[in-house]
Design a protein with these regions (language model features):
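Proteins enriched for Cys/Gly/acidic motifs involved in redox and nucleic-acid/cofactor modification
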Residues: 94-134, 140
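S-adenosylmethionine
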Residues: 180-290, 299-302
Length: 302
């Protein structure tokens, strides 16, 4: 039986900032914030997440212990892979991620769907993207804002496939989704089947290695700040003129850096969302200017 490893960090809730410090250290070490479950009980706050490698779990535990946070208790425990789903079900219940999209755990598929809600069925298993995290919710909000603009959609770091499924529900005709984690891609494929749909492209590949053919009407990138800055040229190039680029995963301490470094004359900032110390930004790519000479010879049909 395969094992996964739960890392738990118990903190004093009364010590302001401990949870934020811990999250920031973990995110900077490569743990996606959407994987971290935060619970409060009495005067304690507990952060927990799961790793498939014991060495990786121990490395993160040592990193947190090295912070020497007062009253912090760090532990690593192995659990059977099959037990992960049972544990996760305690935290994951049906909810509306936007006013008209309802995320429904697959194990509650027969639950009543409120009138006016579009269900998106999800089995997160070990992948990211349950929709419970602020970054995912803000991106879903941007998708709703741009709904009805049919075309090609690219989801970078798709995780469970949730944003790609929402894009499809909002009218995207061609959906492309990539993730560097093959486990996430496998989960996204299962979620496609659960929703009786298919993506035009779903593969395990990094964005750096992704060979872009054509441009997209909407590109969603939920990545760390430094990765967004490093990849901005390719991100901007992937967007069709008049199309949208939505980025999130920007921790509030990094937002000033992002604002300075992520800039392109080709982009117009349309909206900024801020929730629970996380930022997301929606850009629109400028359409190329048409010179007076290029207008000569054009025929107008009324």
């Amino acid at each position: 039986m395969a094992m996964i490893f739960e890392v738990r960090v118990g903190l004093r809730d009364s010590d302001a900032g401990q949870a934020d410090i811990t999250r920031c250290v973990l995110v900077n070490a490569g743990v996606a914030d959407s994987r971290i479950i935060e619970q409060y009980r009495a005067d304690r706050c507990t952060l927990s997440w799961y790793e498939r490698s014991r060495a990786q779990a121990d490395m993160h535990a040592r990193r947190i212990r090295s912070l020497k946070l007062k009253g912090a208790v760090v532990s690593v425990a192995g659990i059977k892979d099959a037990d992960w789903t049972t544990r996760w079900k305690k935290y994951f219940k049906p909810f509306n991620i936007t006013p008209d999209i309802r995320v429904v755990p697959l194990w509650t598929k027969h639950a009543r769907i409120p009138a006016g809600s579009i269900p998106v069925y999800l089995d997160t298993t070990f992948a990211f993207g349950s929709g419970l995290h602020a970054t995912t919710r803000m991106m879903a909000g941007f998708l709703r804002r741009c709904r009805g603009r049919r075309g090609r959609f690219l989801d970078i770091g798709t995780g469970s496939g949730l944003l790609a499924l929402i894009a499809r529900a909002y009218g995207a005709q061609n959906v492309y989704a990539i993730d560097i984690d093959p486990v996430a891609v496998k989960t996204a494929f299962s979620n496609c089947k659960a929703n009786c749909c298919a993506f035009e492209y779903l593969k395990s590949v990094s964005f750096e290695d992704f060979r872009i053919k054509g441009q997209f009407d909407f590109v969603a990138a939920n990545l760390l700040t430094q990765d967004l800055i490093r990849l901005q040229k390719k991100l901007v190039g992937a967007v069709a003129p008049g199309g949208y680029l939505a980025v999130s995963g920007i921790f509030h301490d990094n937002y000033p850096l992002f604002s300075r470094r992520f800039s392109s004359r080709a982009l117009v900032r349309v909206a900024v969302a801020h929730e629970k110390k996380w930022y997301a930004v929606l850009f629109r790519k400028r359409a190329p200017a048409v010179s007076p000479l290029s207008r000569q010879g054009q025929v107008s049909v009324e």
